[in-house]
């Protein structure tokens, strides 16, 4: 008789209902996996992600929690527009068809979702709420519009947030990002920068790596702002620095290519420099981490304390987004400045003494001049360590930390600067020049200016009749949609045609799941939030997770609920990896193709194991595995062997092994029927007692593993339990076998639920089992037996055995190795060791 997984799995998938109770009497547990983009097909990464979450949800449900475990679709985004353009199909149709396909696939995995709470971010019933949030953000000063330099993706033809630029390229298209000046809507995430930073320490159940990444992105810097006078202009150049103590070593100043002073130069309001435009274009083409290049502006600035001028450059390593978009360069103590100074033959003036540069005698410090300092150009790098200040007038002799305080105090006395805290984090630009996104609820009127759409007119819904025949935003070209009467004066006005960044939708969806109508219901949110277990990839550490933390603070400020942190425990699951294959011509092969070629004797290049990806074809279709082996086998494999947070390597043999285990377990229970759920094994002794102890110790251990998300350890323990039960003699230990099976079937359910549920029909359902505490305590102990301090054997004896009895048993255990008449003395430490001295 063979286990018919197909009929069993379909039966229970059709039967299961995991709706959320409305009573609110049970303790809640909110389990959520990061919701998917509806690409049309799930991959192995999805399967692993959702299986991890489902184990936690099922385990918590078995322990009496009211579990919220919803699913939805992150449905807006550029791929839908590309598909519309390529296939002559509307983004809405493409998206909804994909959702239907993926819903079917997810249900085939047997996930215990609250399907009644399913949502899709492209539905007006969903995004009408975020349009209202935006209007409330405006009222509370958390949203504003300004003209600013933005990151422009020339391929996707849209603006990117700083977080969406990776190594100077668009995170999705891979195109080199350009700088453009556009009017954009921003959210004031910087209002919460300090709180976002401080509260990272309260997230005890977040991976340290994620917290470190966010800490670095927020980028708190303590330093000073200094004003330099621009020679020949009635202007001041404001500079932020974290190294104010090195000011006496400054040999130049530099600004970003987008700095306002550069625009003044280009407009001819001050100095005309023929090569300026060419130089700026070259600078813009070079990223921050490229070779350090610059162009001299023809301007100089006055040193605040010395009678000298510093040349002003435009440089590629100065970022407009950081500080004031301007720096002073001290080449001796900053590596970027050092490389720049070497390229443009600028003085390198050390002001911190160290073994690296050589200590300047105190008597010579004040006479140490720039020309002498230039001799230090023999050094190959800047010195950035601690030391004593010299060649710095009133700072001479001070340690670096003292010098920082002293010079800032001097800035404040002279009213040329002050102590400043700066953040790398900048306000979130949310305007995108795309159609398939949530419309920004703003109207522009020539007479009234910027007018919010009245709340009664929400949602502002996307038009369906748009064309994708050319680039850019179709909403800009729509003949009717963007034209609307002004809500204030009634005259003709125009809608905002930009849509929200799609991270806007994913920054609050977890709160929408709390209520049945997908709104932000304060009581429902305060009941279920924060999410107790949030599962997803570490690639979302900065973008999605940081924005979500900001949104909770913003919504709390606007009175929607009282939650600052959205996610209590964050599990960043690793990737699913597979070997890569190429044929003789270097063409990528699917694993099945490679297997077939190898079987035919053809040459196949086997590459390294990498993350599964479409481009390298090293993928395995979850649907194929589910069809061939069943959902339980697929789930078990992605949860076995590897901790959730680590990358796992695909193995066909591993899948086969999981399939064999599922079938073995089914056969074992079938052969041992009927199973008596009213077993009584309180009085078992001897070998059966030892088996019972082992079963309960495994139960205790795997329960602890589940509490701590060591899911691979749970699998190892219930497989060990299966083997133990199979060893028990059915003639003498049937009652213990029954107990073991009842425990085993219950603990496998979160992992292989279809099989477990079908077997429960034989034994009856029950709550999560609890280990018998009395069986967890050993009544025996292993003792080391030494002869003259050297280990000879070990003995197992009763705990707290009297010392004389312990000595006798120890001597008997080594009787073949010693002459007992020569024993001089015996030292015994109960429960630990015996040493026989001869």
UniProtKB/Swiss-Prot annotation:
ATP binds at residue 614. A motif ('KMSKS' region) lies at residues 611-615. One of its GO terms (cellular component) is cytosol. Its main location: cytoplasm. Its EC number is 6.1.1.4. SUPFAM superfamilies: Anticodon-binding domain of a subclass of class I aminoacyl-tRNA synthetases, Nucleotidylyl transferase, ValRS/IleRS/LeuRS editing domain. GO terms for biological process: leucyl-tRNA aminoacylation. A motif ('HIGH' region) lies at residues 36-46. It is found in: Cytoplasm. The keyword Ligase applies. Keywords: Aminoacyl-tRNA synthetase, ATP-binding, Cytoplasm, Ligase, Nucleotide-binding, Protein biosynthesis. It holds the Pfam family tRNA-synt_1. It is an enzyme of class 6 (ligase). Coiled coil: none annotated. InterPro entries: aa-tRNA-synth_I_CS, aa-tRNA-synth_Ia, Leu-tRNA-ligase, Leu_tRNA-synth_edit, M/V/L/I-tRNA-synth_anticd-bd, Methionyl/Leucyl_tRNA_Synth, Rossmann-like_a/b/a_fold, tRNAsynth_Ia_anticodon-bd. It catalyses: tRNA(Leu) + L-leucine + ATP = L-leucyl-tRNA(Leu) + AMP + diphosphate. NCBIfam families: leuS_bact. Belongs to the class-I aminoacyl-tRNA synthetase family. This is Leucine--tRNA ligase. The gene is leuS.
């Amino acid at each position: 008789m063979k286990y018919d997984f197909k009929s069993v799995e379909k039966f229970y998938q059709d039967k299961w209902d995991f709706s959320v109770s409305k009573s609110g009497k049970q303790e809640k547990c909110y389990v959520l996996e990061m919701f998917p983009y509806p690409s049309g097909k799930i991959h192995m990464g999805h399967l692993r992600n959702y299986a991890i979450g489902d184990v936690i949800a099922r385990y918590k449900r078995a322990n009496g929690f009211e579990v919220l475990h919803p699913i939805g679709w992150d449905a807006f985004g550029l791929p839908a527009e590309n598909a519309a353009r390529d296939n002559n199909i509307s983004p809405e149709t493409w998206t909804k068809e994909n959702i239907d396909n993926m819903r079917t696939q997810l249900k085939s995995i047997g996930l215990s979702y609250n399907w009644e709470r399913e949502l899709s971010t492209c539905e007006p019933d969903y995004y009408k709420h975020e349009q209202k949030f935006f209007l409330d953000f405006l009222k509370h000063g958390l949203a504003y519009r300004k003209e600013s330099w933005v990151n422009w993706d020339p391929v996707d033809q849209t603006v990117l947030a700083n977080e969406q630029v990776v190594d100077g390229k668009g995170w999705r298209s891979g195109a080199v990002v350009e700088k453009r000046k556009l009017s954009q809507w921003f959210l004031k995430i910087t209002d919460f920068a300090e709180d976002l930073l401080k509260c990272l320490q309260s997230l005890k159940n977040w991976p340290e790596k994620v917290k470190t990444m966010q800490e670095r992105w927020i980028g708190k810097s303590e330093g000073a702002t200094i004003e330099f006078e621009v020679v020949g202009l009635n202007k001041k150049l404001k500079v932020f620095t974290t190294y104010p103590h090195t000011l006496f070593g400054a040999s130049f100043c530099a600004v970003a290519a987008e700095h306002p002073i550069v625009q003044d130069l280009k407009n001819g309001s001050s100095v005309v420099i023929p090569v300026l435009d060419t130089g700026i274009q070259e600078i813009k083409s070079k990223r921050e981490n490229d070779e350090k290049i610059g162009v001299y502006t023809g301007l100089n600035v006055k040193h605040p304390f010395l009678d000298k001028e510093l040349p002003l450059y435009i440089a590629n390593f100065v970022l407009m987004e950081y500080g004031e978009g301007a720096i002073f360069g001290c080449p001796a103590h900053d590596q970027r400045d050092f490389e720049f100074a070497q390229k443009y033959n600028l003085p390198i003036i050390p002001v911190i003494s160290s073994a690296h540069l050589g200590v300047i005698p105190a008597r010579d410090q004040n006479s140490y001049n720039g020309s002498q300092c230039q001799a230090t150009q023999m050094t190959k790098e800047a010195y950035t360590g601690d030391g004593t200040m010299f060649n710095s007038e009133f700072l001479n002799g001070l340690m670096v930390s003292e010098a920082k305080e002293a010079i800032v105090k001097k800035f404040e006395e002279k009213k040329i600067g002050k102590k400043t805290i700066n953040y790398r984090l900048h306000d979130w630009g949310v305007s995108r020049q795309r159609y398939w996104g949530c419309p920004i609820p703003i109207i522009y009127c020539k007479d009234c200016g910027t007018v919010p759409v009245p709340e009664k007119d929400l949602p502002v819904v996307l038009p369906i009749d748009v064309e994708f025949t050319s680039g850019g935003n179709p909403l800009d070209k729509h003949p009717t949609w963007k034209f609307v009467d002004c809500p204030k004066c009634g005259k003709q006005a125009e809608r905002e045609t930009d849509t929200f960044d799609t991270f806007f939708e994913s920054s609050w969806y977890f709160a929408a799941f709390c209520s049945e109508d997908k709104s932000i219901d304060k009581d429902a949110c305060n009941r279920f939030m924060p999410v107790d277990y949030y599962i997803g990839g570490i690639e979302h550490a900065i973008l999605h997770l940081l924005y979500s933390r900001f949104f909770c603070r913003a919504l709390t400020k606007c009175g929607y609920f009282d939650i600052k942190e959205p996610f209590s425990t964050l599990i960043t699951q690793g990737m699913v990896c597979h070997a890569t294959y190429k044929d003789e011509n270097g063409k990528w092969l699917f694993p099945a193709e490679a297997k077939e070629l190898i079987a035919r004797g053809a040459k196949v290049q086997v590459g390294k194991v990498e993350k599964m990806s479409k481009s390298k074809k090293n993928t395995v279709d979850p649907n194929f595995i589910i069809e061939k082996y069943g959902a339980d086998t697929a789930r078990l494999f992605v949860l076995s062997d590897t901790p959730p947070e680590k990358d796992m390597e695909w193995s066909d043999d591993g899948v086969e092994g999981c399939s064999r285990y599922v079938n073995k377990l089914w056969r074992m229970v079938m052969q041992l029927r009927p199973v008596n759920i009213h077993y009584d094994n309180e009085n078992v002794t001897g070998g059966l007692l030892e088996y019972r102890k082992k079963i309960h110790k495994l139960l205790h251990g795997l329960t602890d593993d589940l509490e701590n998300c060591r899911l691979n350890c749970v699998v190892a323990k219930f497989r060990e339990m299966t083997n133990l039960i199979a060893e028990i003699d059915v003639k003498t230990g049937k009652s213990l076998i029954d107990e073991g099976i009842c425990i085993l079937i219950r603990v496998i359910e979160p992992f292989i639920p279809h099989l477990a549920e079908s077997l429960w029909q034989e034994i009856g359902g029950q709550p999560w089992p609890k280990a018998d505490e009395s069986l967890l305590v050993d009544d025996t102990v292993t003792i080391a037996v030494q002869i003259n301090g050297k280990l000879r054997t070990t003995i197992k004896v009763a705990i707290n055995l009297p010392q004389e009895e312990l000595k006798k048993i120890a001597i008997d255990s080594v009787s073949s190795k010693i002459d007992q008449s020569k024993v001089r003395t015996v030292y015994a430490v109960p429960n630990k060791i015996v040493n026989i001295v001869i």
